[in-house]
Design a protein with these regions (language model features):
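OB/S1-fold single-stranded nucleic-acid-binding modules
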Residues: 1-37, 41-49, 92, 97-109
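Short nucleic-acid-contacting surface segments enriched for D/E, G, S/T with interspersed K/R
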Residues: 29, 72-87
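Hydrophobic core residues within well-ordered beta-strands of beta-rich domains
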Residues: 34-36, 54, 84
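Residue-level recognition of well-ordered beta-strand positions that form the cores
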Residues: 37-41, 57-59, 87-89
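OB-fold (S1/OB) nucleic-acid-binding surfaces
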Residues: 43, 47-67
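A short acidic, glycine/proline-enriched capping/turn motif at secondary-structure boundaries
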Residues: 63-65, 72-74, 91
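Residue-level recognition of conserved beta-strand positions in structured domain cores
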Residues: 68-69, 101
Length: 109
């Protein structure tokens, strides 16, 4: 598995990218690799151990998860209302699931 974050090549239309089977957020289990997709409903910049971190909340019809990218204040193309798919291994953070530095794919608007 590559440690690099996946981005779509500039010459490949996003709509042509095939995603693996996405799991509904409500069915996502901690410590199991999954793909989830939904709409960005909240974005905050929050420092973690003195480093910048971007946190976004992603919601589908079944629930909400949080994704945090450490060392980032923003990610190009990630805006409120944008559809996004993320993949990674979520962990429980308090009472909700959180992905740390997940891979992501921006979906058509």
């Amino acid at each position: 598995m590559s440690l690099l974050r996946r981005k779509q090549p500039d010459d490949q239309p996003i709509a042509s990218v095939a995603l693996p089977q996405c799991t509904p957020i409500a069915e996502t289990q901690p410590r199991q690799h999954v793909w989830v997709k939904g709409k960005v409903i909240r974005m905050t910049a929050r420092p973690t151990s003195g480093q910048p971190a971007l946190a976004i909340s992603i919601s589908d019809d079944t629930g909400t998860v949080t994704a945090v990218w450490t060392g980032r204040r923003e990610i190009g193309g990630v805006t409120l209302g944008r559809k996004i798919a993320i993949d990674g291994v979520p962990f429980m953070h308090g009472d909700h699931l959180e992905f740390t530095n997940p891979g992501y794919t921006l979906l058509p608007k």
